[in-house]
């Protein structure tokens, strides 16, 4: 597991980090870590990342399952992908596709009435207003490659990353 402290629920940078998280290890088969670790090299059984935001803090982490002999190589490849996001802004084409994918996933999640009710309750609790999917879409559409790179540099900084290895 590789992770870092992230933004709280009300931090506007959370939207950029959500998009970065989706790019890295989201549910799509096109997630960077899935392609690098699983599809190209066959090193992991599973790889996924998550972002959890609380009222006062947040956590971002990536989980991967691999053979013991592959741990160092996998950690190197994860670090390399994090460094790429920190050092190379996304192209406009890649950013547009990532935005479209995330908005589609949000829309599908809202079709689940239980998830939508939980999101609405969380928004009322933490923001004192209901969940507004259109506002979420606008926040995603407003993101620039520079926004994502800046957030990547803040969250994925080598000095802020923690690693937990289960053996």
What label would you give each PLM region?
Residues 144-153:
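Low-complexity, intrinsically disordered Gly/Pro/Thr-rich segments
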Residues 1-7, 34, 38-87, 92-142, ...:
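M16 family metallopeptidases and their MPP-like homologs
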Residues 18, 148, 163:
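Short, conserved catalytic/metal-binding micro-motifs enriched in Asp/Glu and His
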Residues 1-31:
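His/Glu-based metal-binding/catalytic segments typifying zinc-dependent metallopeptidases
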């Amino acid at each position: 597991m590789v992770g870092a402290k992230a933004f709280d629920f009300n931090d506007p940078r959370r939207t950029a980090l959500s998009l970065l998280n989706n790019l890295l290890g989201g549910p799509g088969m096109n997630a960077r870590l899935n392609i690098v670790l699983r599809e190209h090299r066959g090193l992991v059984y599973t790889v996924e990342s998550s972002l959890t935001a609380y009222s006062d803090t947040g956590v971002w982490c990536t989980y991967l399952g691999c053979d013991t002999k592959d741990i160092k190589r996998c950690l190197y490849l994860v670090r390399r992908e994090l460094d790429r996001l920190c050092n190379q802004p996304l192209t406009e084409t890649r950013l547009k596709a990532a935005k479209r994918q995330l908005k589609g996933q949000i829309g599908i999640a809202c079709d689940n009435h239980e998830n939508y009710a939980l999101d609405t309750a969380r928004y009322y609790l933490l923001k004192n207003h209901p969940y507004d999917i259109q506002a979420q879409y606008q926040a995603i559409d407003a993101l620039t490659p520079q926004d994502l790179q800046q957030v990547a540099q803040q969250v994925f900084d080598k000095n802020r990353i923690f690693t937990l290895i289960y053996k």
